[in-house]
């Protein structure tokens, strides 16, 4: 049972990832709902060629690139024809061509007037379709990025999925009726709006469908959480493809027993497993032929809170970061229009990849361990839906290596460019994780966040406001009056104008009055600036987080350095800290915007107060007020 976690402190040091080990699965017919206690006397069997599999998966801690839509992105998909596809709330669909490294924009469609509510890509990667509440299905030729057909429906579609294998004569498409029990099969190339077959499969409307091409079987889930198998050819139960006759012999009632529903279904490339994500934040992995549970991963907030209190560094976060992410999770639970999370398999079917509160987890299903977590440091994005690219997904192409290049001393970089494509909560962007960390260009406009769409008018206005305010003259020193004495600080408005403006405006407005020094670590630093007094609160004068302002001349190279606390890159608010020793490991992570020039003894006095296990002083030490000279 894996989960996310939270940390207490607010933003200074970062921790390295560790792996939590759990027991292996023996074989398909013997289900294990894991992880459970390790069996005595048995050693965990490693996954053969594990490192080779991991080398074919993204590994960067931060997303390499992001590209814009005009509205919140809700769907992402990867085509075997080397295309990425994304859809958004405003009904727009974008095609992106995969290059040797990265992607390039190919085509933009206004697919529907309303939000895209379903996106499906065929197994061969040649066809794509979308549905919305406008009674229409749009079908696209992926390779030529052209809309080839439109099916007008007499009902509102609920789910859509392609149901044909490579080589089939007809490219069949299954569409469910959102308000009835029927599922309809269409031939988009026929030019007809009439289905070639229709059948009532469930006792309730179908909500989710996923095709297993290996067994030519559809797996579907209805609005009550009931799971059904049915043949894509006969629309009957596929007796020859499974090892059970009654669902009571399986775990397929697990979803309804847990009183939840189905968010998404994904099938492994070998057709032997499928995953189900649900609103209860549990990811369930089933064996296809037996319908038995293989794994259950609990990603609930209760487990996250328990792990935050544990000693597992892989799952712990700084307190302010943890609090912010918890607030986002609670907002996410109330947002019905948010993208439905899913859990995808890698090409070997040995690893499961899904987004969590903590980041994107890569789980080794064989050893039941966390292989890696991507994006843990990206505290501004809550990733939801993911799609995986690992090169030629059809497996038909063979990449030939020239003899001269087949040298063991040559580069070990993979021939493909494995990429995770994902969308995030309330974000207008698609994000890509690869095996490369983002570059740091000298020109900030050439950064990893590509502005391929014109920003909204309100965004342009807010940027203009910030820019104009930064041009005004700013104070170069302040005096902080505390319960233990006065601290005189020199500021650097030319090097970091936004940070100094934020700090001095808060000082003038009395924002910091009576704030506690809530975190004190002897031999490190003293921290304050949180109105809540626990490291989870505070905001900037603009009501949102603002970017870091690193300058090569301002480093954490001496004690009594004034620096901004944060929860990751570009997450500055109101909290700040004063170091009591040189802390060079914080360079380029926290914005240095001042130095203490008088009152060092006061800083040392605060540093020496007794604290509890959470570094909170037993005796309250407060900022009384801050004097800012008139500029």
Swiss-Prot record:
GO molecular function: chromatin binding; histone binding; peptidyl-prolyl cis-trans isomerase activity
Catalytic activity: [protein]-peptidylproline (omega=180) = [protein]-peptidylproline (omega=0)
Keywords linked to the UniProt accession: Chaperone, Isomerase, Nucleus, Repeat, Rotamase, WD repeat
GO cellular component term, pick one: nucleus
Record domain PPIase cyclophilin-type: where: 474-628
Compartments where located: Nucleus
Gene3D superfamilies: Cyclophilin-like, YVTN repeat-like/Quinoprotein amine dehydrogenase
Alphabetized CDD domains for the sequence: cyclophilin_WD40 (cd01927)
Stated name of the protein: Peptidyl-prolyl cis-trans isomerase CYP71
Organism classification: Eukaryota, Viridiplantae, Streptophyta, Embryophyta, Tracheophyta
């Amino acid at each position: 049972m894996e989960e996310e976690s939270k940390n207490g402190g607010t933003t200074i040091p970062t921790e390295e990832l560790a792996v939590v080990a759990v027991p292996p699965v023996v074989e398909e017919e013997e289900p294990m709902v894991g992880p459970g206690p390790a069996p005595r006397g048995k050693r965990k069997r490693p996954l053969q060629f594990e490192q080779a599999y991991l080398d074919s998966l993204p590994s960067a801690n931060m997303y390499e690139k992001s590209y814009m839509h005009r509205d919140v992105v809700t769907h992402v998909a990867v085509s075997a024809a080397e295309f990425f596809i994304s859809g958004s709330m405003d009904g727009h669909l974008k095609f992106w061509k995969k290059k040797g490294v990265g992607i390039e924009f190919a085509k933009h469609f206004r697919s529907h007037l309303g939000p895209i509510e379903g996106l499906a890509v065929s197994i061969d990667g040649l066809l794509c379709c979308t549905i919305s509440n406008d009674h229409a299905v749009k079908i696209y030729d992926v390779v030529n990025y052209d809309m080839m057909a439109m099916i007008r429906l007499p009902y509102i579609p609920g789910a859509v999925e392609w149901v044909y294998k490579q080589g089939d004569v007809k490219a069949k498409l299954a569409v469910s009726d959102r308000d009835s029990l029927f599922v309809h099969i269409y031939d988009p190339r026929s030019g007809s709006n009439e289905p070639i077959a229709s059948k009532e499969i469930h006792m309730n409307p179908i909500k989710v469908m996923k095709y297993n091409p290996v067994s030519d079987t559809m797996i579907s889930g209805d609005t009550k959480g009931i799971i059904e198998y049915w043949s894509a050819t006969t629309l009957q139960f596929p007796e020859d493809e499974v090892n059970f006759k009654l669902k009571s012999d399986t775990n397929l009632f697990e979803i309804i027993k847990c009183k939840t529903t189905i968010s998404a279904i994904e099938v492994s490339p070998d057709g032997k497993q499928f995953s189900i994500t649900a609103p209860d934040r549990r990811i369930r992995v089933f064996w296809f032929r037996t319908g038995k549970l293989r794994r259950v991963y609990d990603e609930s907030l209760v487990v996250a809170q328990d792990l935050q209190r544990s000693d597992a560094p892989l799952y712990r976060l700084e307190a302010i970061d943890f609090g912010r992410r918890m607030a986002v999770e609670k907002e996410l639970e109330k947002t019905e229009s948010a993208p439905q999370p899913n859990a995808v398999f890698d090409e070997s079917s040995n690893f499961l990849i899904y987004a969590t509160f903590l980041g994107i987890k890569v789980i080794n299903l064989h050893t039941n361990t966390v292989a890696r977590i991507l994006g843990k440091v990206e505290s501004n994005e809550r990733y939801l839906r993911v799609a995986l690219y690992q090169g030629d997904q059809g497996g038909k192409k063979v990449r030939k290596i020239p003899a001269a290049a087949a040298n063991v001393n040559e580069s070990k970089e993979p021939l493909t460019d494995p990429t995770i494509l994902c969308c995030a909560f309330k974000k207008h962007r698609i994000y890509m994780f690869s095996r490369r960390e983002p570059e740091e260009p000298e020109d900030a406009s050439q950064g990893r966040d590509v502005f391929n769409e014109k920003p909204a008018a309100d965004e342009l206005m807010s940027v203009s406001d910030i820019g104009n305010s930064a041009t005004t003259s700013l104070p170069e020193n302040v005096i902080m009056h505390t319960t233990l004495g006065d601290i005189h600080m020199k500021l650097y408005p030319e090097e970091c104008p936004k940070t100094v403006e934020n700090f001095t405006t808060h000082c003038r407005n009395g924002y910091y009055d009576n704030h506690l020094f809530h975190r004190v670590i002897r031999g490190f630093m003293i921290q304050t600036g949180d109105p809540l007094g626990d490291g989870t609160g505070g905001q900037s004068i603009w009501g949102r987080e603002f970017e870091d302002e690193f300058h090569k001349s301002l480093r954490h190279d001496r004690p009594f350095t004034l620096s901004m606390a944060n929860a990751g890159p570009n997450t500055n608010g109101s909290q700040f800290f004063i170091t009591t020793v040189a802390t060079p490991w914080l360079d380029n992570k926290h914005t240095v915007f001042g130095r203490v020039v008088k009152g060092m003894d006061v800083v040392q006095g605060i540093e020496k107060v007794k604290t509890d296990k959470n570094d909170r002083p037993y005796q309250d030490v407060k900022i009384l007020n801050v004097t800012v000279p008139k500029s």
